[in-house]
Amino acid sequence: MCLLIDAGNSRIKWALADTARHFVTSGAFEHASDAPDWSTLPAPRGAWISNVAGDAAAARIDALIEARWPALPRTVVRASAAQCGVTNGYAEPARLGSDRWAGLIGAHAAFADEHLLIATFGTATTLEALRADGHFAGGLIAPGWALMMRSLGMHTAQLPTVSIDAATNLLDELAENDAHAPFAIDTPHALSAGCLQAQAGLIERAWRDLEKAWQAPVRLVLSGGAADAIVRALTVPHTRHDTLVLTGLALIAHSA
């Protein structure tokens, strides 16, 4: 049994896995929220941790583990040149984020023998190009949908700050008015839709460019908290997989 922890900038996701491909239970919590209830969980043989949220998150994770399973062995996952069938094309492999690395490993296992473009929607939107043979060819990083909207609100004098929940409601309203969709006739709707279309445009352009460059079909795989919103703007085929990082961590743990 392995405890898997994926600490992102917005949330900490966790799972208990009894094999490389099966979670016994899982959950998620906000950084500032109450601790997860691990009181009934069986003791794992160790914890495998991907943390891109900094020192404070690392300290909290350590405290949570220590409170439930004192002295439990912990492995902080870092990207390497090659692991679990994936080779790292970064110029400096260790500088690739551990979440992106684990996600690549999870995606390669989930969609074996397929070329992939993996789009993950969180605080940042990341794109990873993964060849069918497991070679990570490189990626792109852009502001996430929420960060785009928040940045416009913070750094312009007259634009509002729109949250994801508010933007989702605004887009529902816009979709009901076919006469204007996808163009808006007021600022909050225009900001919400514009940032959403920017996300979708990035994904679709990258997918088409990759298929052209590789002269082969590429599966577009979507993951992350904002994927539900982005999907509504996409016009290309895609597949959802929302546990890529945890799946990758499970594979890493069971290969140790």
Swiss-Prot record:
The active site is at D99 (proton acceptor). Keywords: ATP-binding, Coenzyme A biosynthesis, Cytoplasm, Kinase, Nucleotide-binding, Potassium, Transferase. GO terms for biological process: coenzyme A biosynthetic process. It comes from the Bacteria. It catalyses: (R)-pantothenate + ATP = (R)-4'-phosphopantothenate + ADP + H(+). Substrate binds at Y90, G97, S98, D99, R100, T187. Its cofactor is NH4(+); K(+). A monovalent cation. Ammonium or potassium. It is an enzyme of class 2 (transferase). GO terms for cellular component: cytoplasm. It is found in: Cytoplasm. Belongs to the type III pantothenate kinase family. Homodimer. NCBIfam families: baf, PRK13328.1-1, PRK13328.1-4. This is Type III pantothenate kinase. It comes from Burkholderia mallei (strain SAVP1). The lineage of its organism: Bacteria, Pseudomonadati, Pseudomonadota, Betaproteobacteria, Burkholderiales.
